[in-house]
Curated annotation (Swiss-Prot):
This is Uncharacterized lipoprotein MPN_083. A lipid is attached at C22 (S-diacylglycerol cysteine). It comes from the Bacteria. A lipid is attached at C22 (N-palmitoyl cysteine). It is a lipid-anchor. It is found in: Cell membrane. Residues 91-111 are annotated as: Disordered. Keywords: Cell membrane, Lipoprotein, Membrane, Palmitate, Signal. Residues 1-21 form the signal peptide.
Length: 533
């Protein structure tokens, strides 16, 4: 397998940004994947935030994502946005620290109760979710954007969820002579990057493809955007629109030791943090234009960097797969697993790496490691000479070069974005939640601006986010609607996550049904249909 890492977005500038007098539209060309790793040194890394730290609950919510196919390993960051199942179930432990499901023999794990399913929904960027190409995905995501089967080399072979934490795993003998077992034993007592392979491949719950009913044509002289649904087969020079936001569905079979560990040690704390932060009604900000400018911005994610910390991989070995049980009843509507609905992952034996020379995902916060200063603000005219960036908010509808290929089809970015001062997280951090001083998520991080006037493609210290919920106080000068809501929907948004939540009766939908907030409850009485599946 050729290991080419696609680890995030870099947005390249053909002229020096800080001293440019041209417009933002003029010097933003097509975003492209970065294939290097970040070397920034000013951020706090590999430090689990304390319980009273503003970053603490977002640490609980956040994970590193690893998609592997025959061509590449792709890393991104994701965070819990929703779930389905009993988040209060405590998987009991015996004195050896194993979950009850781990201590049963495989022959005992055949009942529907043992095969029950907890489903985590992880938000990330659309360009990160492009790494998921699963033949058993929901339609239309089970084929490429042209309706064709994925080429074999593009198909996702395995998926792992990662976190910087105490590994809490037993020593596994490997085929490596070094590091010695004693060294590994010591490393297992320290905070490390732990990747766990889930028992099955994820699916796509939501992709922000054509969230609004407009198409984009760069050759039109009287306006680039045209009202009406875009058709990939007869679009001519037109292309559809996208926002850099997606949600993947991660099934956890609680009779599988790896899945049980993810649920018990990572997902349950994430659901508790989610509720602490305000649950569905309080977690997702929707503010007016001026409020975004006045906010302070915090970011926690997993950019790929060089560091000396250990990485451990807990794979689906034959022993763990034996703990899975499936129902053959494809009409089964209970919370059990069917063979037809999930793709079992191939075995990946457990292994340990003390140092990976090419870098590994690194827990990083936008906290200055020298001064301790936390967070940042949007870029302003005192820090940059380009007046079109003066308020730190941008309208992607007018930036012709923001084009993304998702599942082999090109789309044009729309919506609004935040430009973060001195928060240039590198590849692998794409998909991180950007949250404000009130601990509300207001946008999702998708890349850093890069200056290509030098041979080194230097990062200029500015990060980019996609705003998830834009109210009517945003006044676009372009044809696309100036309000949208990628999570709960609004009058302009025809494809949004709450449609999936309703169809699958998730935690978010249960809260939407009972809310008195008209904006969050928009879809309760909406006749807007699900656009993608």
């Amino acid at each position: 397998m050729v290991k080419v890492w696609k680890i995030g977005f870099g947005v390249f500038l053909p002229t020096a940004l800080l001293f440019s007098a041209c417009s933002f539209k003029d010097y933003i060309p097509t975003p492209s994947f970065r294939k290097d790793f970040s070397t920034e040194n000013n951020f706090v890394k590999n430090k689990v935030p304390g319980k009273d730290d503003i970053y603490s609950k977002f640490y609980d919510l956040t994970f590193s994502l690893n998609f592997v196919n025959n061509q590449a390993q792709e890393f991104g960051t994701g965070w819990l946005i929703d779930w389905k199942g009993d988040e209060n179930k405590n998987l009991s432990k015996n004195k050896e620290g194993q979950t009850a499901s781990q201590t049963r023999s495989s022959s005992e794990q055949t009942t529907d109760q043992d095969a029950n399913l907890f489903t985590a929904y992880i938000a990330t960027n659309l360009h990160v979710a492009d790494g998921l190409k699963n033949d058993q995905d929901y339609a239309p995501y089970n084929k490429d954007g042209w309706g064709q089967p994925y080429p074999y080399q593009q198909k996702t072979q395995s998926f792992l969820l990662g976190k910087y934490t105490k590994p809490n795993v037993q020593l596994v003998k490997t085929n490596y002579e070094k590091p010695e077992d004693a060294v590994i034993e010591q490393k297992l007592k320290e905070d490390s990057l732990l990747f766990i392979q889930t028992s099955t491949l994820p699916k796509t719950a939501y992709a922000a493809i054509d969230p609004v009913n407009f198409s984009y044509n760069p050759t039109r002289t009287n306006g680039f955007w045209t009202a009406g649904k875009y058709n990939v087969y007869n679009g001519g020079n037109s292309i559809g629109n996208y926002a850099d936001f997606a949600v993947i569905e991660v099934p956890l079979v609680l009779s599988n030791p790896n899945d049980a560990k993810i649920y018990q040690e990572w997902i349950r704390p994430a659901t508790q943090a989610y509720k602490y932060l305000g649950d569905v009604e309080g977690l997702f900000a929707k503010k007016g234009y001026r409020s975004y400018i006045q906010d302070f911005y915090h970011l926690l994610g997993y950019p790929v960097t060089k560091n000396t910390k250990s990485e451990f991989i807990l794979g689906q070995s034959q022993g763990t797969v034996n703990h899975m049980s499936f129902s053959n009843d494809e009409s089964n509507t209970t919370n059990t697993i069917t063979k037809a609905s999930l793709t079992q992952q191939p075995h990946k034996e457990q292994s340990a790496y003390v140092v990976r020379e090419s870098g590994l995902p690194t827990l990083t916060m936008n906290v200055d490691k020298y001064t301790g200063a936390k967070g940042t603000h949007l870029v302003n005219v005192d820090q940059i000479t380009d007046l079109s960036l003066g308020d730190g908010l941008i309208d992607f509808g007018g930036l012709s070069r923001f084009i993304l290929q998702y599942h082999n089809v090109n789309y044009k970015q729309f919506g609004y974005g935040t430009i973060l001062w001195d928060t240039n997280f590198g590849g692998g951090s794409s998909g991180s939640a950007i949250f404000n001083q009130n601990k509300q998520i207001n946008s999702i991080y998708f890349g850093a601006l890069v200056n290509v006037t030098t041979d080194r493609n230097e990062n200029v210290g500015l990060g980019l986010g996609q705003i998830l919920r834009a109210p009517n106080t945003f006044n676009s000068s372009h044809e696309v609607p100036y309000s949208y809501d990628l999570i709960f929907g609004d009058v302009n948004t025809t494809n949004f996550y709450a449609q999936f939540a309703k169809k699958h009766n998730t935690h978010m939908w249960s809260k939407i049904q009972s809310t008195q907030n008209g904006e969050i409850g928009f879809h309760k009485n909406s006749k807007t249909g699900q656009q993608r599946h």
